[in-house]
From Swiss-Prot:
Family of the protein in this entry: Belongs to the ESS2 family.
Entry annotated with the keyword Membrane: no
Compositionally biased residues, Low complexity: 125-136, 464-477
Compartment annotation: Nucleus
Organism the protein comes from: Caenorhabditis elegans
Protein name: Splicing factor ESS-2
Amino acid sequence: MSSFDKNDERAQLMVPKSINEGKVVKLSQKTLVTKKIERQVVPEEKYIAGLDKIIEKDYFPHLKKMQAQKEYLEAVANKDINKIKELQMKFCSTGSVRTDRSFRTPITTRSTTEAPDVSSFDADTPGPSSASTSSAHDWMQSPMPFANEEGDNEALNRKRKKKKEETLTSYLNKYTSEDNASFEELAKVMREREDARRPWVYKAEEEHNKNLVTRQAIAAEADVQLALKHAVDADDNRPLNVDNWAYKAWNTVLFNPDGAALTPAEIADAARKQQTEINKRGTRFPDSGKLKPSDEAMTRAAVSHALANAGKVDFLGNEVTPANSFKLLETPNPNPDDMDSPLMTWGEIDGTPFRLDAPDVTEHSLPGAAPVFKIPEVPYREKIAQSMNDSIAAKYRDKRKVAMRAAEGAHFSRTPGFGSKRVSDKLAQLSPAAQKLATKKLGLKMLPAHKSPFASPKIMSNWSRPSSSKRSTTPGSAWSRGSTTPGSSWSQGAQTPGTPGIESMIRRKGDNVGPSTSAGAADRANAGDFF
């Protein structure tokens, strides 16, 4: 029997199949696990101070210079001479001390065997010559510049390692504050509490996703699909779950979705964007704007120079023009005591020299700056005149207010009291019902004009009252309730003299109504006055 026949027999035998046979396992994408960055926890004050130092160094290098100028201007305003001297000595370089030439000394202290550096002195300052120095110098006692302490020549190849300056990103990756560290610890504790409170949720998710096997056909690998087909009589032992369905505890139905997975191109783009690049030039003006004046400023300077030299001649009698108009300049002296020059310093801040009492950048010096209108300050004389004018105007306003109050008090008097002529006229014009109401409720006694019971009541007046009346006739008491006190109002039957009553207004029988009436009859009211 050949080997081929044996193989055919073996193929006809039923071999038990495993559970996972016929299943396609889809491997997940490999994930790169990186080491967690451990930051050093520092106090809050130290952390903030380090951030301030790096930000000032990298993004605002001119801040130190501006702070010095601010301190100087405040010292000048407060007339603090000690502070001014301190700032001058602080920002004055060691090579240019503002002292007399005769008192200038070398800055650094040298040994007796070492020759002083001639370059540290000024050109006009006499110093030791090189010949005398070389004759007195002992070369055996001086260290060799080409050898180290042991005498080897290895020192020539050794270079001091330059200290790497720390950037803002490296500082944030290396250090963290106590507040940030405590917050991360609290967040970690909360996550652990959540896992301990609902372990069944996260455990079920982990078990399901670990045993998940996808059985979806892969169209790109058709030959693999044909090789992994199940036999017709084989049992289907597949788990009763949906194909390609991963379980997640925080599902997208009840919670916000995390979003679709990123493609390789998007991952590469995100990694490239994580490399932060800070434009430090955007935090300051360019130096060319401070040093180079604008074209408008140069044009204005040329025009003003030409107008100032118009009609002038030089020592040869030629007219001075802008082309050949040069001035004689004096040799600058760094000592401000000799010349009235502005206080300057030769420092190591930004530029040498710079003025402490004036800004470096002006609005007119910037390129493309437009002309600026500036209102001059009010002169001191104008301020005094304005204050005097305001004080005089305030006095006049006070006098006017006092006069207006006096006029208002005289014009707007009190409400007329009862018993006056105007009130009596109004009461006389009332209806009988109103007069009855005044009699009962207000206590006014209304006397009838005639004996007839149907006659209209009347208010007694001083003119019609008989002389034998026992009621009060005190002047000034009107419509009083039987009171005889002078000045009391609402007296019963008492009226101020001169007040007309109803009796004088009613026409009696037999009165003469013709044109030849008397003076008393002419003052009586007509019937038409009541309608």
